[in-house]
């Protein structure tokens, strides 16, 4: 950059020898200056850690900032990465710094993004809660486990929230009204589909997300911690954002990716929107935790009467094992109701050919 600006230097600096001299001075100042600045930055946490008897290791990385941070994080076995949401280049309308955004997209380590600094923003009134948002994904339950640990260590109250959107299909069907021809409506079975959503899917969604909350509450209870739960309805990131603005929690914990994300997704859409907009500190959880099968089943799985009858025909000494296997099969495939057909599918999938008949495990159909 300095060399690009050389043509604009005063005339007395245009001599070749003088230019070379200035280049050397500039290079030395920049190299040494950057080292001094970096070491000065590290001195701040170094002395804070010393005062609190916390071991400290400083690293001065040379190179493009976000590239070197990503490389170091991915090569190291860190439990947690802490970054400010904004850097030195922040302006009034900045929502997230480019370095922070580039780093979080390229790492798979739990990351705390600091957004509220009392010395800068003042002590704002708020709930002081540790809040965990769950959607049934392993990442959100992993965040819950971390939230429980933090709540225990800090003595702060824990609240678990979940949000579902029962209104999306209304917008979808309204948009289709003026698009589908009569023939297409018949093929799509427009009226039947709309009624199905109104009668079943809306109520089913509420039940699913309430189950996530009950499961989360049970997990916290097993850890010896009381918590509160809250179900929100509406556009997910909008409702969680509204909640965060009203409650002003101390920390909001989000799964890095959600229940509908592909495994190789860098960050989920709701998490990304909330990271930019919520006024509180945010933790992105890369930790994955799966609740016990029986705990999930108790809150989210029901059996038809026929399926229950078939289950009772399984010999008692293997019934618990068979029940767990059937539940796991159903959960992995997203079933909330176990029918006789699901039992048959599960046993065919689990047992070798002919074993069902030989062991007489599933009774008469």
Predicted regions and their residues:
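The conserved phosphate-sensing helix
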Residues: 316-324, 337-340, 356
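Protein-protein interaction modules outside structured cores
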Residues: 203-207, 241-242, 257, 261-265, ...
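Glycine-centered tight-turn and secondary-structure capping sites
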Residues: 96-97, 255, 267-268
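Conserved RecA-like P-loop NTPase ATPase core
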Residues: 311
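Conserved C-terminal helix/linker of AAA+ ATPases
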Residues: 329-350, 357-363
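Intrinsically disordered or low-complexity boundary/linker segments at protein termini
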Residues: 1-3, 74, 79-91, 95-154, ...
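Structural beta-alpha unit
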Residues: 2-7, 17-81, 191, 197-252
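Flexible internal linker/loop segments at domain or repeat junctions
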Residues: 174-200
């Amino acid at each position: 950059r300095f060399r690009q600006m050389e043509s604009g230097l005063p005339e007395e600096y245009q001599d070749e020898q003088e230019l070379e001299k200035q280049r050397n001075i500039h290079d030395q100042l920049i190299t040494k200056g950057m080292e001094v600045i970096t070491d000065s930055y590290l001195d701040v946490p170094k002395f804070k850690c010393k005062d609190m008897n916390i071991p400290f290791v400083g690293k001065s990385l040379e190179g493009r900032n976000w590239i070197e941070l990503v490389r170091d994080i991915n090569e190291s076995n860190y439990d947690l990465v802490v970054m400010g949401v904004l850097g030195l280049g922040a302006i009034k309308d900045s929502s997230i710094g480019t370095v922070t955004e580039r780093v979080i997209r390229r790492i798979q380590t739990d990351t705390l993004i600091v957004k509220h600094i009392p010395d800068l923003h003042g002590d704002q009134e708020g709930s002081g809660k540790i809040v965990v948002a769950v959607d049934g994904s392993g990442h959100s339950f992993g965040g819950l486990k971390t939230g429980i640990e933090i709540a225990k260590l800090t003595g702060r109250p824990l609240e678990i929230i979940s949000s579902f959107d029962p209104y999306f299909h209304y917008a979808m069907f309204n948009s289709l009204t003026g698009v589908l021809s009569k023939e297409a409506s018949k093929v799509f079975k427009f009226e039947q589909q709309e009624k199905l959503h109104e009668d079943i899917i809306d109520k089913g969604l509420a039940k699913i997300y309430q189950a996530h909350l009950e499961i989360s509450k049970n997990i916290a209870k097993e850890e010896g911690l009381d918590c509160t739960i809250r179900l929100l309805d509406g556009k997910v990131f909008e409702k969680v954002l509204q909640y965060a603005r009203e409650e002003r929690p101390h920390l909001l914990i989000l799964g890095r990716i959600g229940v509908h994300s592909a495994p190789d997704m860098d960050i989920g859409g709701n998490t990304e929107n909330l990271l930019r907009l919520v006024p509180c500190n945010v933790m992105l959880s890369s930790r994955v935790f799966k609740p016990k099968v029986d705990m999930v089943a108790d809150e989210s799985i029901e059996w038809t009467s026929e399926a229950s009858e078939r289950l009772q025909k399984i010999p008692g000494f293997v019934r618990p094992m068979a029940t767990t296997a059937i539940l796991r099969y159903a959960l992995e495939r997203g079933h909330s109701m176990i029918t006789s057909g699901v039992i048959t599918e599960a046993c065919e999938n689990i047992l070798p050919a002919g074993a069902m008949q030989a062991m007489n495990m599933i009774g008469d159909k």
